């Protein structure tokens, strides 16, 4: 989107769509903001991991100030933007503090995505995964901050704990899927397995690949909407689907087996089940949120 020609693709060819871009914000400058201002259908989620020391420790020296500078520019041009926060065991206190939320609001953020740390990759550090107490806390804290009464003027969305609003996992083409830089059609940005590539297959063929069909046959992966993911909370599900469909790892640097990936999640899933079931049982609106009619007809709707 560095040129007016690229802007035309969004505005003229796809004026009936709204686009959301996740970015580290390092390429956002005044000229860029002027181009985006002409569009009206493009929003940005700027990656931020906490305050300066924590953020730059993960994303590089000086990035925190660049992000704040980009926010101030976008605010000046009246652009609609927010942040993308990955919460971990180490930064949980910071990214859920009043000071952090107030900082985002001060610099013009209208919303913020909160993503649970996923131990994806052969070298992923499982020690960064939140504790059970931390996950319970952020479940309650997000709802507190975005409440109409007593909350703050910013819309917060928790990718892992807001499953109740979308019927659990939306991946695998149910409502969403991911295409990586190589063109591989993956179920989710966190799930690097596929049996189709957009450079070799049509969009419909990508959606009909065996792995995606297995996803849709099995959704929701759990009737407890606080246990939505076939990797993090139901690791046996992803292993089974990858094995039965013959999907291959799409990690170009270091291919990871589903068994290795899900093995890192099994202790977490077992421990979280007790906490999640307790919270869900106390939920005032206990319901699936999504009905898989195919599995119900075939008599397999028991999770």
Annotate the PLM regions.
Residues 1-6, 10:
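Single conserved hydrophobic/aromatic residue that forms the stacking wall/gate
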Residues 11-14, 35-40, 75-76, 104-107:
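Acidic (Asp/Glu)-rich catalytic clusters
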Residues 15-20, 80-81:
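Short beta-strand/loop segments at the ligand-binding rim of alpha/beta enzyme cores
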Residues 24-28, 89-90:
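Short beta->alpha connector loops
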Residues 47, 56-168, 172, 181-182, ...:
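Radical SAM enzyme [4Fe-4S]-AdoMet core and its adjacent flexible, acidic
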Residues 190-303:
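Flexible mid-to-C-terminal extensions adjoining Fe-S/redox cofactors in radical SAM and related proteins
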């Amino acid at each position: 989107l560095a040129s007016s020609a690229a802007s035309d693709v969004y505005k003229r060819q796809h004026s009936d769509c709204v686009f959301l871009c996740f970015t580290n914000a390092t390429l956002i400058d005044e000229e860029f903001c002027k181009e985006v201002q002409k569009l009206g259908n493009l929003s940005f989620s700027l990656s931020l991991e906490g305050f300066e020391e924590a953020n730059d420790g993960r994303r590089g020296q000086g990035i925190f100030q660049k992000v704040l500078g980009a926010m101030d520019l976008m605010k000046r041009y009246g652009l609609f933007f927010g942040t993308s926060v990955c919460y971990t065991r180490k930064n949980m206190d910071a990214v859920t503090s009043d000071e952090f939320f107030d900082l985002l609001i001060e610099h013009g953020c209208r919303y913020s995505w909160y993503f649970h740390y996923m131990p994806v990759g052969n070298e992923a550090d499982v020690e960064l995964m939140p504790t059970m107490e931390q996950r319970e806390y952020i479940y309650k804290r997000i709802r507190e901050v975005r409440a109409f009464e007593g909350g703050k003027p910013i819309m917060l969305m928790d990718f892992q704990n807001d499953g109740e609003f979308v019927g659990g996992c939306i991946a695998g083409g149910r409502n969403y899927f991911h295409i990586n830089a190589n063109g591989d059609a993956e179920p989710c940005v966190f799930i690097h397995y596929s049996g189709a590539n957009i450079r070799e297959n049509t969009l419909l063929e990508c959606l009909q690949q065996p792995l995606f069909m297995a996803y849709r046959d099995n959704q929701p992966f759990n009737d407890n909407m606080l246990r939505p993911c076939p990797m993090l909370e139901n690791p046996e599900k992803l292993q089974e689907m990858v094995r039965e469909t013959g999907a291959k790892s799409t990690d170009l640097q270091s291919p990871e087996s589903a068994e290795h990936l899900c093995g890192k999640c099994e202790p977490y899933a077992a421990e979280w089940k007790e906490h999640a079931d307790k919270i869900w049982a106390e939920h005032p609106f206990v319901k699936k949120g999504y009905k898989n009619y195919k599995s119900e007809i075939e008599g397999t709707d028991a999770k």
